[in-house]
């Protein structure tokens, strides 16, 4: 399956890649996958 890499916006289609998790929202209102 396709996963969302670190420092990319969290996408409903695709979980964050292993070792990262969805964090946010940031000041721009977007949540990003970040390294754990």
Swiss-Prot record:
Its main location: secreted. The record marks 8-9, 13-14, 32 as: Critical for the neurotoxic activity. Transmembrane segments: none annotated. It comes from the Eukaryota. The record marks 2, 30 as: Important for the neurotoxic activity. It is found in: Secreted. This excitatory toxin inhibits insect calcium-activated potassium (KCa) channels (Slo-type). Belongs to the neurotoxin 11 (kappa toxin) family. This is Lambda-hexatoxin-Hv1b. It comes from Hadronyche versuta.
């Amino acid at each position: 399956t396709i996963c969302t890499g670190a420092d990319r916006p969290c996408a409903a289609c695709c979980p964050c890649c292993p070792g990262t998790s969805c964090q946010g929202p940031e000041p721009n209102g977007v949540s990003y996958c970040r390294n754990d």
